[in-house]
């Protein structure tokens, strides 16, 4: 019997709705990965509602929880770590400490860093120290980085003027250490208004993917968290990077179609679960180069 992969997901959690782990855990489980959620934040709901209740996990608790898993002899079964929104650089360093501990018992364990800073339409939402930490420290450790356009702009210190400018910016981030950079949402002058575009960049090549852009009265939150989680899950399940990229784009599109059909602000993960596991649509990633 083939072994089921195990993944430690270190990010925020909301009681109501879907953001952070609340957007990523169930879809990763639905495609066949055992997920260990370590919630860095527990809020009543995501912050785009404008009000919320809850608390943030103190940074020192993260390595404590990792050590607790080690104490029962299970840490070596961790095949990958996913990290998302960081409230501080201290929280980020605590995550890197946990990753170091995991790699000590499983050197093959992968790390995907989702460098959450904000949304292109909503602006940056993290302190400068977090942006600096992600670029100067996390990128050197991560196997995969999954920024959106705002985050890629922040790392690059500029805005792109073309698709090929986006590619150059992603390659500059790749040079900092990751094996692959997945840009979850491209935005550049001249981009077709009816398309949603993504980019995958590795040392071996670069691939561009375009799917239809769906309209919403209010953009659902958690799409980036869903994207990063599914990409890492599919890699753990044996997909090559391009196949994982294509699967992720299709599965996320299926969720958005169901969300749109329900006229919902929150992602309709449960209603779309069968199509997350087996997307009906397919989008082809096409090779591009400078």
Swiss-Prot record:
* Residue positions binding ATP: 114, 151, 184, 211-214
**An MF annotation (GO) of this entry:** magnesium ion binding
- Keyword check for Transmembrane, yes or no: no
Short name of one Pfam family for this protein? Phos_pyr_kin
SUPFAM superfamilies (UniProt xref): Ribokinase-like (SSF53613)
Q: So which residues are the signal peptide here?
A: none
User: CDD domains under this entry?
Assistant: pyridoxal_pyridoxamine_kinase
Q: What class of enzyme is it?
A: transferase
Q: Which GO BP annotation is one of this protein's?
A: pyridoxal 5'-phosphate salvage
Q: Which residues bind substrate?
A: 12, 47-48, 225
Under InterPro entries, the record lists: PM/HMP-P_kinase-1, PyrdxlKinase, Pyridoxal_kinase_PdxY, Ribokinase-like
* Keyword entries, A-Z: ATP-binding, Kinase, Magnesium, Nucleotide-binding, Transferase
Show the catalytic activity. Answer: pyridoxal + ATP = pyridoxal 5'-phosphate + ADP + H(+)
> Which cofactors does it use?
Mg(2+)
Q: Specify the domain of life of the species encoding this protein.
A: Bacteria
Q: What is its EC number?
A: 2.7.1.35
- CC terms in the record's Gene Ontology section: cytosol
Task: Give the metabolic or biological pathway.
Answer: Cofactor metabolism; pyridoxal 5'-phosphate salvage; pyridoxal 5'-phosphate from pyridoxal: step 1/1
Q: Which family, according to the similarity comment?
A: Belongs to the pyridoxine kinase family. PdxY subfamily.
What's this protein's function? Pyridoxal kinase involved in the salvage pathway of pyridoxal 5'-phosphate (PLP). Catalyzes the phosphorylation of pyridoxal to PLP.
HAMAP family, alphabetized:
PdxY
Instruction: Please give the subunit comment from the record.
Output: Homodimer.
Stated name of the protein = Pyridoxal kinase PdxY
* The organism of origin for this protein: Pseudomonas fluorescens (strain Pf0-1)
**Record gene name:** pdxY
